[in-house]
UniProtKB/Swiss-Prot annotation:
Residues 11-38 have a biased composition (Polar residues). Residues 137-319 form the tr-type G domain. GTP binds at residues 146-153, 212-216, 266-269. One of its GO terms (molecular function) is GTP binding. GO terms for biological process: positive regulation of translation; translation. This is Translation factor GUF1 homolog, chloroplastic. It is an enzyme of class 3 (hydrolase). It is found in: Plastid, Chloroplast. Gene3D superfamilies: 3.30.70.240, Elongation factor 4, C-terminal domain, Elongation Factor G (Translational Gtpase), domain 3, P-loop containing nucleotide triphosphate hydrolases, Translation factors. Belongs to the TRAFAC class translation factor GTPase superfamily. Classic translation factor GTPase family. LepA subfamily. Residues 1-38, 106-126 are annotated as: Disordered. The keyword Transcription does not apply.
Length: 735
């Protein structure tokens, strides 16, 4: 249906100064009689005093008169708000949001009116100040060392807020922890860096670069590279809990890098805080002078100015080596869908700018730099970065494998003579199989792993096929936490339902023909006749515990084939236990048992120390005379019987009964060491026989026995998914 033409549409007329003169409406057509009639309205507000004009759509069709009136009302309100914004002194509570919404005059835009009417001048100018260059003598690069839950993220938040790097209205808890998993677990997984501008009491401006570090032992290599990019570190210790195991591990890494360490006693506001006791602990255990340790409460903001002053006065500036060939240390990287891999680095020597051709010295790949900038903590592009500065670069890099943590960046035109020391390839230590519950999700699982690998060069995976589980992947991880994080991200971010096999470690198998092979999958272990010996990785584990739990923890270590090395009392009430332990004994529930037996008070840290020969055997689980590969495990010879007995008994409870008897066996080679049987369901074939000749009954029973025999030879026992999941959980506990 055609829309009637309106010779004289409703409109808005304006004078030169923007005021509304009149409105005209057509009287030739009654809009109430013609609902489909459209009124055309055009509105324009001309801003006075040099402000830019705001123009609404020149033509806008409205389907009734009320809508036209509504538009006219909005235009009038817009005009009224603009006039009110000119009188900012009379309306101090409009705030930054109102000023941005109604586009206040340019001379007012740089003032951020807070809720209490006071101007906060740490808005637009602060970003410009952070980009301003300072002498290299005024640069400080530092990190924060702390155990889990000792307040590292809270302290970082306060430093960002106190220096004005992040405005109060933008602040949130754990600002540098972007992943949901990091917030939920209270740990740092992906590194972050933040550039802060700090002005001391004399008015001198400093550039402070905070390089965050992950706190878990799985990422100890990343921690070492982050510390290598700094000249100092804040040692944060909970004033109520004292020194923990992970604190010691990271402090030793910092001392190896010759960093200036500033002790900070956090959480002094807690009722159980005892700063004097913790000072003595630090001096006795680590050997640091804590007479000038800073008392701090990051939550309440106590001691933050003292920490900033200590960073400026005690941590030395970087060396002025800007004239030398470029050498930059990569301490983190991540994959961006649009720019490729974005590299976080510290310039150790030389300069780098946009357009330079750079080479990653260990991977031997070359790229042209598309963008360089600083992290404040958002990415802010700059023209150039020189020695001592921390920033990022993007160069259309397609894989994080080309820009690994610890690699050295140099320019193609003027290459450095040698790379920075300390580079290592991240080597997976723990392996497990990942299988989708729904076989149709195999392709989705592969795509999800490929996406995760773009951000995580340490993650390795390869296809794996199982007769019982179908198609899946054998994945390698840095440690148990790394494995848990990847599994949880696959399930949460990609919506996958997964079955995970029992975790295993990498074994070295010496074969009879003189070759040495590495095996991470128990089902791929060579036959016993081809094996000469098997080596397994060992770790040095240090346990810090109150003296009341020394006995239970020593029992736990001995149960896991631990070799006692040392015990010492670090204080009157706390002791340190050192053991050499097989890594395979830790990948189960060792940490859970540690916390359970110590009531949560003990902490641990470990480091891999090499391989040792052990008496290991492959334990196969056979169901109805068929080996089930995902249930195979490598165990010590002394534990094989108990593990086999536990697995067969559990499977007997979980597998449903069939019309034929199902044998469940735990085998070492061809030798059965444990066995259980699931009895067959009985079908009463004699129910219709009410008497008569016994030969009829014998004939029916014989026919039933032949059918069961044929069914057993041809039948297939499907282990249900919940049984698999339960038995795999049991494997993680008993292995």
């Amino acid at each position: 249906m055609a829309v009637p033409t309106i010779p004289s549409p409703a409109c808005i007329s304006q004078s030169a100064n923007g005021s509304i003169i009149s409105t005209r409406r057509s009287t030739e057509t009654n809009p109430r009689q013609h609902p489909s009639t459209s009124y055309r309205c055009a509105g324009r507000v001309v801003r006075r005093q040099g402000r830019s004009a705001i123009s609404r759509s020149g033509s806008r069709y409205l389907h009734d008169l009320e809508a036209g009136r509504s538009l006219l009302k909005r235009v009038t309100l817009r005009r009224d708000w603009d006039s009110r914004l000119d009188e900012k002194d009379q309306y101090p509570r409009l705030g930054a949001r109102a000023a941005a919404t109604f586009e206040a005059k340019p001379e007012n835009a740089e003032k951020d009116y807070s809720k209490n009417g006071k101007a906060a001048n740490k808005g637009v100018d602060n970003g410009k100040d952070r980009l301003a260059k300072v002498p290299i003598s005024n640069i400080r690069n530092f990190s924060i060392i702390a155990h889990i839950d000792h307040g590292k993220s809270t302290l970082a938040d306060k430093l960002l807020q106190t220096t004005g790097t992040v405005l109060a209205r933008e602040m949130k808890e754990q600002f540098l922890d972007n992943m949901d998993l990091e917030r939920e677990r209270g740990i740092t997984i992906k590194l972050q860096a933040a550039r802060m501008r700090y002005v001391d009491e004399t008015g001198e401006a400093y550039c402070l670069n905070l390089i965050d570090t992950p706190g878990h032992v799985d990422f100890s290599y990343e921690v070492s590279r982050s510390l290598a990019a700094c000249e100092g570190a804040l040692l944060v210790v909970d004033a109520s809990q004292g020194v923990e195991a992970q604190t010691l591990a990271n402090v030793y890494l910092a001392l190896e890098s010759n960093l200036e360490i500033i002790p900070v006693l956090n959480k002094i506001d807690l009722p159980g805080a005892d700063p004097e006791r913790v000072r003595r602990e630090i001096e006795e255990i680590i050997g640091l002078d804590c007479s000038e340790a800073i008392l701090c409460s990051a939550k309440e903001g106590v001691g933050i100015p003292e920490i900033l002053n200590a960073v400026v006065k005690k941590i030395p500036p970087p060396k002025d080596t800007a004239a030398e060939p470029l050498r930059a240390l990569i301490f983190d990287s991540y994959y961006d869908s649009y720019r490729g891999v974005v590299v976080y680095f510290r310039v150790m020597d030389g300069r780098v700018k946009k357009g330079d051709y750079v080479q990653f010295m260990n991977s031997k790949t070359e790229y042209q730099v598309d963008e360089v900038g600083v992290l404040s903590p958002i990415q802010m592009p700059v023209n150039e970065l020189y020695a001592g500065e921390v920033g990022y670069l993007s160069a259309s890099i397609k894989s994080v494998a080309d820009a690994r943590v610890g690699d050295t960046i140099t320019t193609v035109s003027r290459k450095a003579a040698q790379a920075l020391p300390g580079y290592q390839l991240a080597t997976p230590m723990v392996f497990c199989g990942l299988f989708p519950i729904d076989a149709d999700q195999f392709v989705e699982l592969r795509e999800a792993l490929e996406k995760l690998q773009l951000n995580d060069a340490a993650l390795q995976f390869e296809p794996e096929t199982s007769s019982a589980m179908g198609f899946g992947f054998r994945c390698g991880f840095l440690g148990l936490l790394h494995m848990e994080i990847v599994q949880e991200r696959l399930e949460r971010e990609y919506g996958l339902d997964l079955i995970t096999t029992a975790p295993s470690v990498v074994y070295r198998v010496h074969c009879t023909d003189g070759t040495i092979t590495e095996c991470s999958n128990p089902s791929a272990l060579p036959d016993a006749g081809k094996r000469k010996s098997i080596e397994e990785p060992y770790v040095r584990i240090e346990l810090l515990t109150p003296k009341d739990y020394i006995g239970p923890l020593m029992e736990l270590a001995q149960e896991r084939r631990g070799e006692f090395k040392e015990m010492k009392f670090i204080t009157e009430n706390r002791a340190s236990l050192v053991y050499m332990l097989p890594l395979g004994e830790m990948v189960g529930d060792f940490f859970d048992q540690l916390k359970s037996r110590s009531k949560g008070y003990a902490s641990m840290e470990y480091s891999v120390k090499g391989y040792r020969e052990s008496k290991l055997v492959k334990l196969d689980i056979r169901i109805n005379d068929e080996a089930v590969d995902p249930l195979a495990v490598i165990v010590h010879q002394d534990k094989a019987y108990s593990v086999g007995r536990a697995l067969t008994q559990q499977l007997k409870k979980l597998i449903p009964r069939q019309l034929f008897k199902i044998p469940i066996q735990a085998c070492i080679g061809s030798k059965v060491i444990a066995s259980e049987n699931i009895a067959a369901m009985r079908k009463d074939v004699l129910a219709k026989c009410y008497g008569g000749d016994i030969s009829r009954k014998k004939k029916l029973l014989k026919k039933q026995a032949e059918g069961k025999k044929r069914m057993k030879s041809l039948g297939r026992v499907d282990v249900p998914q919940d049984a698999f999941m339960a038995i795999l959980r049991l494997e993680k506990e008993v292995v």
